[in-house]
Amino acid sequence: MKIKSKWFVIFIAAVLIIGTAHYVFAAQNDGSQESAITLEEVVVTATKTPEKRKDIPNAVIIIDKKDIQASGAKSIGELLANETGIDWQTYGNYGGANQEIHIRGMRGNATQVLVNGVNVGSPSLGIADVGKISIDNIERIEIVKGSGSLLYGSGAMAGTVNIITKRPKRDKMDMKVGAGYGSQNTYRVAAENGMFVAGNFGYYLTAGRTETDGFRDNSYLRQNDASLKLVLDKKDIIDISLYGDYINRKYGMPGVKPPSGTRDYYIGGEKFYNSEAAALLDHSGDKDGHVVLEVKGKPVKWFGYDLKGHYTNMENHNYERYAYNGSGYENWVTNQVLGTDGHVDIYPFEGAKLLLGGEYKNFDWKNEGFDLDTTGKQTVKTTNEAQIFTKSAFTEAEYRPSQYLKALAGFRHENNSAFGSQNLPLFGLVINPFETTALKINHGKHFLAPTPNDLYWPAGPYTRGNADLKPEIGWHTDVTLEQSLLNDKLFMTISYFHWNVDDKIQWEPDSQGVFTPINLASYKADGLEVGTRIGPFYDLTLALSYTYTDAEEENREYTRQDYGWPPFIPPDFQYSMVKRRASYTPDNQFKGDLTYKSNFGLTVTATARYVGDRVVYRTETTTYPDTKTVTYTLNSYWTADLKVQQRLYKHWILSLSGINLFDKEYDTHLTTFTDQTTWKTSPAMYPGAGRSVFASVAYEF
């Protein structure tokens, strides 16, 4: 790929420039330890144990509570969008739209999202919807880029996002109540309280309610969420925490925006679509709950432990009607996960650490569905159930022979009841030529297991699962340089990455014309990430991030799709395999934040984001059954956001935020729409949300 020569040379040049900067600014650092604050930040997710940022071989992003407050973001997706290597993707930004985090050009199922170290992604989809996680409950987010399969198994191919929730503080009571209202009849009320109530025992409780009508017809959201964390903290000897959360939400599924001029369409007095939404009757709902019990400690200098037990219950309801005759489908998909994992970390001598761990998960999957007749009544019922379990053992060894060098190596063996086993090695190296410089190199194998939907989807006339799927496998390599200068008032990071995936799982028509998942081909990418944070100077802080991704996919290009008339006339599908630019992956992304923070409680943050163009491929009929592949382009776009926050009398917080201030129009995904009055099928988009404003007031005790 073209980036391998051109951009790797640019990366090396940037490394030399940043390295030289150490000497230029060394005198201003005065050798002070304060200059290494950023690289001294502690990260848990990268190695499952607390490590300083300068000691881990991965590129990381760390976002704390102050960053969240200053951002004005109302969701995790808004918060992380366009950070280095991060692409936030939705189907239109409406109330209940699925929100995925894509890292370094990989799909959403290649990012493992954790809450307190436990995967919260949907097992049946293999993707985590971060829109279901309340931002009020977050203390800190750690994003570790690069292969995470060594420690976290399937799905951690591009990276891991670990969301750490709030916990009580000693000698301090936390209490906050707030309410806000904004565009599209959106409101949010929330409350939280935490403290130690008896010696070493404490709690932290959050609860909230969100409603919005959305920016299009049938894009509403109604959501209730709550969480509770109980802790028994005896410091290093033992720390026991019991965490639980629950979310109950209902939301509309508006589909694409039909072409201009589309008229209202009715069947039997029910309106099925209009010019704003292709689906006015479709809706979904989620009832998700998680419970995590964690026991950890480091009773002696040379030994630590961390044990978890967890249970997840996720129920998703979908109701869908078809505009061509009014029939439809309604189903409930239930995922239950019971698991345990743990590790011990041993420090045999100075500079050395050995981590030994294991994990077990049991997945129960159930899909209960009903066909709907033309009036929307339930008719034929189908029920499918499956069980999958995984068990694994992993080890990781680290050694730092001097302050200038650290090496890491690890290995994981995982057994999956559906497809067998995988062996996953990882190697890392950290070079610290100076106290405020870290050169990081890591190379690891990753994999993605097929989901229960892929394996066991009910067999029907148009779709069915494939129990013979293999996992996706590949390797991820990255080289990162991090440099802190001017007493941490200047922080720079630059990363070069390369990854590849074989046996990509994709749904395609089989020899009988039935769509089924297959291990199709491969895809890969090279890229460059650059980020800097400057300040505060004169109460101003500037943060910039840029990501270049050159991603390539191998896929089918069909020249003929003849569904025949089985069993009399067999189907005939003809295609060739081609390599092309990866779909829905922008080459260029940029984010700039400028924050002003006064000494009288005022904080103002202006954010600009740029997303480059994205390509989409569709198979279209020329003269049946002949077809061709048509390439569509979703245009690049800029958005601008502004957040103003004023703290009054120490306890009151007034906030006003504006998203997409200039009301920029842009599209997020593409599919087709068929007008039932003309039978014309044309491309149609999922539009992004326009300008919105949200004002809130909160009181902190």
Question: Model-derived features: where do they sit?
Answer:
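Transmembrane beta-barrel wall of Gram-negative outer-membrane proteins
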Residues: 181-211, 216-254, 281-304, 348, ...
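Face-selective signature of the C-terminal outer-membrane beta-barrel domain
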Residues: 233-247, 284-421, 432-434, 490-496, ...
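Gram-negative outer-membrane beta-barrel transporters
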Residues: 400-406, 497-500, 519-620, 698-700
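Conserved C-terminal beta-signal and adjacent last beta-strands/turns
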Residues: 8-12, 21, 231-233, 298, ...
